[in-house]
A protein has these predicted regions:
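Short beta-strand->loop
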Residues: 16-22, 76, 109-155
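A bilobed periplasmic-binding-protein/Venus flytrap-type ligand-binding module shared by bacterial periplasmic
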Residues: 26-37, 130, 134, 150, ...
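Beta->alpha turn/N-cap motifs
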Residues: 1-6, 81-82, 98-105, 123-124
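An extracytoplasmic/periplasmic, membrane-proximal ligand-sensing/linker region
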Residues: 80, 84, 90-91, 101-119, ...
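A local structural motif
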Residues: 66-80, 93-96, 114
Length: 222
C-alpha cells in the first residue's frame, strides 16, 4: 500500500506509518504425501492453488516461487480461496496450495484429519533472499505436532499482521495506543490464542514502513 505495488498498484496510500507489528500470518505451503512434492522446486508442471486473484496470499505465492526461479508459466495456476483450495486438495484437483494465516489453521487441520498432509518448507537461503527483497517477511518455524502426523519442524516465512496509521496521527495518540495495547496483553491472550505471539520485544519485526514517532518513543522506553 505504501509503495503502490501488488494489489495497490495505481492506488498508493500516502503517509502510511506503522504503529506495531503483532502476530505472524504464516505462509503455509500444503500438499499431500502422495503428490511426491518435497520442495517448491518440485512445483514445475504441477497444479498450484495460489490464493484468490489479487489477494495477499497470491502475492506471497508468487514472491516465494520467484525465489526458487519458478514463474506462473511454469505451473498450472489455480486461483482459489482458502476453503476452495482445501476442498480441491482433498478432492485431488490441485497438487499443492498456499495458505497465509495464523497457524494452526482450521482449513489445514480439516484436511489433515483424513489425509497425510505435508508442509513444504521454505529453505533458509531462499527465505534470506526473500527478506532482502521484501523486508516485510520474517522467518518462522512451524513446530512439529502443529498438525496431525506432523513429526518434524518445518521452516517457513510469515508476514506480520501490522497496525498502520497515517502521518496525521499525532505522537501522543500513537504513544497512548501502543501503551494501552501492550499494557493489556493478558486480557488479549485470554480472548484469543493469536495474542500469545504479540510482544513489545517483537513489535518492530517485519516493520517495512516508517514507525510513528509516538510508537517509537514507547518502544524505546525501558
Amino acid at each position: 500500500a505504501a509503495n503502490g505495488t501488488e494489489m495497490f498498484k495505481g492506488k498508493q496510500v500516502a503517509g502510511l506509518q506503522g504503529l506495531a507489528t503483532l502476530y505472524p500470518e504464516t505462509v503455509q505451503i500444503v500438499t499431500l504425501k502422495k503428490s511426491g512434492i518435497k520442495s517448491v522446486a518440485d512445483f514445475k508442471g504441477k497444479r498450484i492453488a495460489v490464493g484468490a486473484a489479487g489477494s495477499g496470499t497470491e502475492a506471497n505465492a508468487r514472491q516465494i516461487m520467484e525465489a526458487y526461479g519458478i514463474k506462473y508459466d511454469d505451473i498450472k495456476v489455480q486461483y482459489l480461496s482458502f476453503g476452495e483450495a482445501a476442498s480441491a486438495l482433498k478432492d485431488g484437483n490441485v497438487d499443492a496450495a498456499f495458505v497465509t494465516a495464523g497457524h494452526p489453521t482450521a482449513a489445514i487441520q480439516d484436511i489433515a484429519t483424513q489425509n497425510d498432509v505435508v508442509l513444504v518448507p521454505v529453505d533458509a537461503d531462499k527465505a534470506d533472499a526473500l527478506i532482502k527483497q521484501y523486508p516485510f517477511y520474517t522467518k518462522l518455524v512451524i513446530k512439529a505436532g502443529t498438525y496431525p502426523k506432523q513429526d518434524a519442524d518445518v521452516s517457513a516465512v510469515a508476514v506480520k499482521c501490522m497496525l498502520a496509521v497515517t502521518d496525521k496521527m499525532d505522537e501522543n495518540t500513537a504513544y497512548a495506543i501502543a501503551k494501552a495495547l501492550y499494557g493489556n496483553l493478558d486480557r488479549m491472550k485470554s480472548a484469543h490464542s493469536a495474542a500469545n505471539a504479540i510482544s513489545k520485544a517483537t513489535a518492530k519485526d517485519g516493520m517495512s514502513i516508517k514507525l510513528n514517532p509516538g510508537a517509537e518513543k514507547f518502544f524505546n522506553e525501558k
